[in-house]
Amino acid sequence: MSQDSHSESKPGHAGDSAAHVLPIAAIVHADHAGTDRLLAKFVDGLRHAGLRIHGLVQERAANADKTSTMLVDQHSGQRYPLFQNLSSGSTSCCVDAGSIAAASVAMRRAVEARPDLCVANRFGGLEAQGGGLAAEMLNVAAAGIPLLTIVSNDYLRAWRAFTGDSGTELQPSIEAMYLWFAGLRARHARS
């Protein structure tokens, strides 16, 4: 993707004038350097502006190992551990599938609550295979609730297939998130 906060010419990128079928966007990144914190900062800004936010944000204490990573329910504040603490010799996936299943209730509640925005910590390997929070993400977007997530370049092709190229791809910046969200709200106000 270009460094411009708008887009490349591919449909579904921020800055396109075409109407999107789904009110869904992903912050696209090459590495995790601060992307979770950017999403959390954006969510905090919207919440302080009086908007209702649901979903999950990923949080990890500075200088902590990845087993300290939590999914934080943006409505209730409940925290779910994202990773299992496996032995150093283990070759199993350390993502805690049971914890993700428990955390998915935050996404399902969003469909009932109809918040201004729902966030999903990321579209990653599990979602690329149809697992993780994939079903919940589609249900939120299909209900017409704006959904924002994070996707690595590694899963960008799967993300595009998942959204049918109807999702918006954002640069990892607060400005890009605000522009996307403001555009959605403006289109909603006109309809």
Q: Residue locations for each model-derived region?
A:
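N-terminal phosphate/diphosphate-binding loop that engages ATP/GTP or pyrophosphate donors
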Residues: D36, A40-S87
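Glycine-rich P-loop/Walker A and Walker A-like loops and their local beta1-loop-alpha1 context
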Residues: S2-D4, E8-I53
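Helix-adjacent hinge/juxtasegments
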Residues: Q74-A113
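Glycine-rich, charge-decorated loop segments at or immediately adjacent to ligand/cofactor-binding or catalytic sites
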Residues: N153-G167
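Short, solvent-exposed loop/turn segments at secondary-structure junctions
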Residues: G34, L126-Q129
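Short Gly/Thr/Asp-enriched flexible loops that form oxyanion-binding sites at enzyme active sites
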Residues: A128-L138
